[in-house]
Curated annotation (Swiss-Prot):
Catalyses which reaction(s): alpha-D-glucosaminyl-[heparan sulfate](n) + 3'-phosphoadenylyl sulfate = 3-sulfo-alpha-D-glucosaminyl-[heparan sulfate](n) + adenosine 3',5'-bisphosphate + H(+)
EC number(s) from the headed UniProt entry: 2.8.2.23
Similarity field: Belongs to the sulfotransferase 1 family.
Main function: Sulfotransferase that utilizes 3'-phospho-5'-adenylyl sulfate (PAPS) to catalyze the transfer of a sulfo group to position 3 of glucosamine residues in heparan. Catalyzes the rate limiting step in the biosynthesis of heparan sulfate (HSact). This modification is a crucial step in the biosynthesis of anticoagulant heparan sulfate as it completes the structure of the antithrombin pentasaccharide binding site.
Highest taxon above the source species: Eukaryota
Main location group: Golgi
GO MF annotation list: [heparan sulfate]-glucosamine 3-sulfotransferase activity; sulfotransferase activity
Native species: Homo sapiens
Expressed in which tissues: Highly expressed in the brain and kidney and weakly expressed in the heart, lung and placenta.
Signal sequence annotation: 1-20
Cellular localisation: Golgi apparatus lumen
Disulfide topology: C256-C265
Protein name, UniProt field: Heparan sulfate glucosamine 3-O-sulfotransferase 1
Length: 307
C-alpha cells in the first residue's frame, strides 16, 4: 500500500511538466490533489485506477476528421485510459488560466502502466496551442487524424447545420458560405481549417515530425484495423486490438466496435449524409486545395488519396 501511495504522489507531482504561466497555481493544485488521492487510496475509494495522470498522448485534431472514432477505437486497448470529454485546456483562456492542477482533474483515474489520452480537435488549428503543449511536456506523443480537405469542409458545415436544426434555427445553405461575389469565399472558417500545411507548420516549430503520428481518416473509416495497428506501434503499446474488434454495420454504413462481447457504434450524429453540392462548385473546392495539399505532402513526407 505504501508503494501504491508513493506511486500515486509521483504520478501527479511532476514539476518538469508545469508550464511557465500557470506554474504556481498548477504546482499547488497538483500537491493538493496528491494529498486527496492519498486519502482516497487509503480509504479504498479511488475509482478505475490509482491516480489521475497528465496525458502522455493528445489527439490534437482535426475537427470533423474522425477524432471521436479514433479515441473510441483506441479505448479498446486495456492500457489506454481516455478522457471522456473534450477538455479545451490549451485553447480556452478560461480553462488554461486554472493551471495544470485543473487539467489534471479532468483526466480519468488510471493505473501507472496505462497511457492517458485526451482529445480536443480544436488544438490543431489554434496558433497558441503548440507552445503551450510543449511547455507542459516536450516529449509528448501527438495524434493527428486527417481526411480529404474538401470532405472535411462539407462535414464541418453539416455539423453546424444540424446543430441549428435541432434548435429550430434557420441556417444558410452551404453555397452561401462557399461562394461570395461569384468566387470561392476563402474567408469561410471551414476552408481555413482544411489548410493543413498552415497549421502543421505551427506544430513543427515545437515538435519534431517523429512525435506526431498522422492517421489517415479516410482509411480509418474504410478499414480501421490497419490504421489502429499503426497507432499502437507509434504509442509503443502491445498489440492488443484485433480485427475481431471491428464489424461493419450495414444499417449505419460504417464500422462499429465489439469489446468483450458487447457491440457499440458511434453516436447517430456521426456519418451523416453531406449536403448535395453543385459539381462545378465541388470542383472549385478541389482546385482550391490542390496546391495546399501538395505543400502538406512535402511537409510530412507522405501523400494521401485526396482530390
Amino acid at each position: 500500500m505504501a508503494a501504491l501511495l508513493l506511486g500515486a504522489v509521483l504520478l501527479v507531482a511532476q514539476p518538469q511538466l508545469v508550464p511557465s504561466r500557470p506554474a504556481e497555481l498548477g504546482q499547488q493544485e497538483l500537491l493538493r490533489k496528491a494529498g486527496t488521492l492519498q486519502d482516497d487510496v487509503r480509504d479504498g475509494v479511488a475509482p478505475n485506477g490509482s491516480a489521475q495522470q497528465l496525458p502522455q498522448t493528445i489527439i490534437i485534431g482535426v475537427r470533423k476528421g474522425g477524432t471521436r472514432a479514433l479515441l473510441e477505437m483506441l479505448s479498446l486497448h486495456p492500457d489506454v485510459a481516455a478522457a471522456e470529454n473534450e477538455v479545451h485546456f490549451f485553447d480556452w483562456e478560461e480553462h488554461y488560466s486554472h493551471g495544470l492542477g485543473w487539467y489534471l482533474s479532468q483526466m480519468p483515474f488510471s493505473w501507472p502502466h496505462q497511457l492517458t489520452v485526451e482529445k480536443t480537435p480544436a488544438y490543431f488549428t489554434s496558433p497558441k496551442v503548440p507552445e503551450r503543449v510543449y511547455s507542459m511536456n516536450p516529449s509528448i506523443r501527438l495524434l493527428l487524424i486527417l481526411r480529404d480537405p474538401s470532405e472535411r469542409v462539407l462535414s464541418d458545415y453539416t455539423q453546424v447545420f444540424y446543430n441549428h436544426m435541432q434548435k429550430h434555427k434557420p441556417y444558410p445553405s452551404i453555397e452561401e458560405f462557399l461562394v461570395r461575389d461569384g468566387r470561392l469565399n476563402v474567408d469561410y472558417k471551414a476552408l481555413n481549417r482544411s489548410l493543413y500545411h498552415v497549421h502543421m507548420q505551427n506544430w513543427l516549430r515545437f515538435f519534431p515530425l517523429r512525435h506526431i503520428h498522422i492517421v489517415d481518416g479516410d482509411r480509418l473509416i474504410r478499414d480501421p484495423f490497419p490504421e489502429i495497428q499503426k497507432v499502437e506501434r507509434f504509442l509503443k503499446l502491445s498489440p492488443q486490438i484485433n480485427a475481431s474488434n471491428f464489424y461493419f454495420n450495414k444499417t449505419k454504413g460504417f464500422y462499429c466496435l465489439r469489446d468483450s462481447g458487447r457491440d457499440r457504434c458511434l453516436h447517430e450524429s456521426k456519418g451523416r449524409a453531406h449536403p448535395q453540392v453543385d459539381p462545378k462548385l465541388l470542383n472549385k473546392l478541389h482546385e482550391y486545395f490542390h496546391e495546399p495539399n501538395k505543400k502538406f505532402f512535402e511537409l510530412v513526407g507522405r501523400t494521401f488519396d485526396w482530390h
